[in-house]
Amino acid sequence: MDFIEAKEEYAAAQRRAQKEYKELLAANKDPNPAVLDELLDDNSARVVQDIGLLEIPAERIVGTRAAGRVSTFSASFLPLAKPSSEFAVKWMNLCQAHMGEVGIRDPITCYEYLGNFYVEEGNKRVSVLRYYGAPCIAGMVKRILPARSDEPRIKAYYEFLEFYKSSKLYTVQFRRPGDYAKLLGLLGKELGDPWSEDERRTFSAYFHYFLDAFHGLDVFDKDILPEEALLMWLKIHSYKELGSMTATQLRKSLTELWPDVVTSTKQAEFVEAGPVTENKPGIINWIMNSIPDRVHVAFVHQLDAATSPWVLGHEEGRRHLEETFGYQVVCRSYFNANSDDAAALLIEQAIDEGAQIIFTTAPKLNRITLKFAVKYPKLHFFNCSVDLPYSSVRAYYGRIFEAKFITGAIAGAMAQNDRIGYVGSNPIVGVPASNNAFALGALMTNPRAQIELRWSCCEGTPQADFFRDGIRVISNRDVPSQNKMYMEFCNYGTYQMDDRGGLIPLASPVWVWGKFYQIVVESALAGTLKDDKINLRAVNYWLGMDSGVIDVSLSDRLPIGVRMMAELLRKSMRERTLDPFRRKLTTQDGIVISDGSRRLSPDELLRMDWLCHNVSGSIPSFDEILPMSRSIVRELGIYKDQIPAIKETNA
């Protein structure tokens, strides 16, 4: 390359720089490279590690160490200086060197901070190499470690450092804790597993292939990271598919998933009522005949009704639909979706048989539900879970803590020695809120009440332990059905034990799934069942006693005064004039969570990870949980981001 050609290349690079500069200015974004000195707090002590020579991903070089000549570059290090400037001449000389036999061989020197690189020496080398599309740039690197904190980005960075020890990859930089563990699991690896050189090269190639598709989207959103999009993509596609798809297929698959990619980076929306039914459909809908007079509904269950009370409760909901709507609804149930392959076959069968609304009734089915929801965007998919970040699949669950508060009040009134046993299910979202609501209910009727907490997901025999310790009032698993047989003849709900271990039922929270299913079908028949993908909303229906989805079953053996109190509490809860958590809340450690002047948000209630001051016991760690309970804790656990990744068998 001669100097005239180098001058032409500079002019082309400058035009690109000016275009980028104007676009960033118009978007109210910094048009120049970032400056590390401006990002760091001058007063904080910093640890600097000498990393040595690295091949740095070019897109990770985002700024300079000091302000210096930062104004001579656009944000991606393209040159802005006049062609007649000394800077431009040096850039052209480097351009000639790069295109010559020798090339640019000297490494740059830079600092790494939070996964990005800031050049101290070699800005023009970076500019030339990035202009020519070099994927990596050699550099001598020093790492600046931020002070540890609970800030999500800092926690995610320290997780990256553990990821880097094995992978030696800088290509992915997550900003949410737990995402590295998720990625490793989706790749079929665990934290600490060694990466071969072949695996590194393959992942880097696949990621850059995905990056091209990501940046080629018409709906590209710079607030979403490509690695976050990849994480969502891998939830419904295997890692092997990433290497086998054509560029067109990959871009199409990412476009179809895009609404869910967007919502996965946002806070999920909790709706404390069912789908809207009161809005009347417009005249156009009537003219176009789009309002159905009959709806086909499918229920896909992980187990079967003969062995699972949970499935039996949902089947009662199906029968409620048939009794309520008659000809207007066609319901079919599909059982034993106990693996992804089995679930896929059953959902496909349901669709082939005409299903328009599909309910998958177990949290573990959420990913396979998402896969089909993306594949069939005109159908409506619901998963019985909570806190799902998808716009294609709506989650639905119940505010069971409301009923737990009432059974806690009953237990407090009935506990003669002030001690009450409580058997928790699993440490998943919403369960600590139920534990605490029960404890607060007990305090309302007995200010001396002490709750002894045990867990059914851990080793041990809680009921036998309580009996041996002299505890005679116990709260156990919730009644899954409106059939009172469960409460009267089994160890469900809250009950007393006599001195021989006999059970006397008192009350239990009850799931009434038919109420929710009725709301959905009414909305569909009215033509008002909305498509949340249009508004990029991740909707989670979280319904309480006011909706009828949650209720309390009261035993005929309750003393009349206690029953009257429970009826009054139930009425207040249904009218939403009673909030169990609108009071002073103090943890076991004496920390005041709230002074009672406000309502806790749905997010605070679902992610509650503390126990009330009158609870003895603790929330179990993942290692303490029995293997049979670990899958649900991985899916919905309150500490799921801290759980080691599990290898995906189809990665």
What annotation goes with each model-predicted range?
Residues 103-118, 123-156:
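A short, basic-hydrophobic beta/loop patch
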Residues 406-446, 537-557:
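An alpha-beta-alpha
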Residues 374-397:
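Flexible loop/hinge segments that line or gate small-molecule binding clefts
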Residues 354-363, 382-384, 471-480, 503-511:
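Periplasmic-binding protein-like
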Residues 527-650:
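Segments of small-molecule ligand-sensing domains
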Residues 296-316, 321, 332-340, 430-432:
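Extracytoplasmic "Venus flytrap"
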Residues 1-120, 131, 176-188, 215, ...:
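Short, charged/polar connector segments at secondary-structure boundaries
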Residues 396-418, 510-531:
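Hydrophobic alpha-helical segments within soluble ligand-binding/sensing domains
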